[in-house]
């Protein structure tokens, strides 16, 4: 679990949000089924140290303090939304979701692809259609990643959502026939195979014609 410190944000509004960003802080909000929205702020320098280790499925221990440094509350939350500047890609706002025990939640879990497909050795290439898998689960049963082994995939082979192995109690929200991973056949391979087939078929047609003339 990642630990993150935040301060209560007393003043709200766009002007205050801009001021915070100029001062090296990121405005955020904490909310949930049983939680009234709590505006907070986080030091950008603190956020940058852990940001690369956090996904939507990562439980975060959020320690909320007042401006005097006194701890107001500690919550287990999940990073639900990241807003970035359209030009600089800088993080400008965060949404943290606090689930309620016994209340199932929807969350995106990173897909971890392991192995090298047989089809890639033959000239194909691996296409991952879903980097994250949307699931429904209990808050205390959130998988950190969903692993899929692609070693046995040959040219044209597909792994569907129904093929994913999920922990008990975790439900995939993709349709059963949704393609998750596939080994695609390069166009040049298809063209070569088609050309060879045409060349093989042509003499047969000529021979049949000669036989008919005889």
Curated annotation (Swiss-Prot):
Cited CDD domains: Ribosomal_L25_TL5_CTC
One Gene Ontology biological process: translation
A Gene Ontology molecular function term of the record: structural constituent of ribosome
SUPFAM superfamilies, per database record: Ribosomal protein L25-like
Region (Disordered): 194-214
Gene Ontology, cellular component aspect: cytosolic large ribosomal subunit
Pfam families: Ribosomal_L25p, Ribosomal_TL5_C
Swiss-Prot/TrEMBL keywords: Ribonucleoprotein, Ribosomal protein, RNA-binding, rRNA-binding
Biased composition (Basic and acidic residues): 204-214
Highest taxon of source: Bacteria
Function: This is one of the proteins that binds to the 5S RNA in the ribosome where it forms part of the central protuberance.
Family annotation (HAMAP family): Ribosomal_bL25_CTC
Sequence similarity: Belongs to the bacterial ribosomal protein bL25 family. CTC subfamily.
Subunit structure: Part of the 50S ribosomal subunit; part of the 5S rRNA/L5/L18/L25 subcomplex. Contacts the 5S rRNA. Binds to the 5S rRNA independently of L5 and L18.
PANTHER family: RIBOSOMAL PROTEIN L25/GLN-TRNA SYNTHETASE, ANTI-CODON-BINDING DOMAIN-CONTAINING PROTEIN, RIBOSOMAL PROTEIN L25_GLN-TRNA SYNTHETASE, ANTI-CODON-BINDING DOMAIN-CONTAINING PROTEIN
Protein name listed in UniProt: Large ribosomal subunit protein bL25
Source organism (scientific name): Thermotoga petrophila (strain ATCC BAA-488 / DSM 13995 / JCM 10881 / RKU-1)
Gene: rplY
């Amino acid at each position: 679990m990642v630990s993150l410190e935040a301060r209560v944000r007393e003043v709200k509004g766009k002007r205050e949000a801009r001021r915070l960003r100029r001062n090296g802080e990121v405005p955020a909000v904490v909310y949930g089924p049983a939680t009234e929205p709590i505006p907070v702020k986080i030091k950008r320098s603190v956020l940058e140290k852990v940001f690369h280790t956090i996904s939507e499925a990562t439980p975060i221990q959020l320690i909320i303090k007042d401006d005097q440094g006194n701890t107001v509350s500690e919550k287990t939350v999940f990073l639900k939304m990241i807003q970035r500047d359209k030009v600089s890609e800088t993080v400008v706002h965060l949404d943290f979701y606090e689930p309620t025990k016994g209340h199932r939640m929807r969350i995106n879990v990173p897909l971890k692809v392991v192995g090298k497909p047989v089809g890639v050795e033959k000239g194909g290439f691996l296409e991952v259609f879903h980097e994250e898998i949307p699931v429904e689960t209990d808050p205390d049963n959130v998988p950190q990643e969903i692993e899929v082994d692609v070693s046995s995939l040959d040219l044209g082979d597909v792994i569907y959502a129904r093929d994913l192995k999920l922990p008990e109690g975790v439900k995939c929200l993709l349709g059963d026939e949704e393609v998750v991973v596939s080994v695609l056949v390069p166009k040049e391979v298809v063209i070569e195979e088609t050309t060879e087939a045409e060349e093989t078929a042509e003499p047969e047609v000529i021979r049949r014609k000669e036989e008919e003339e005889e």
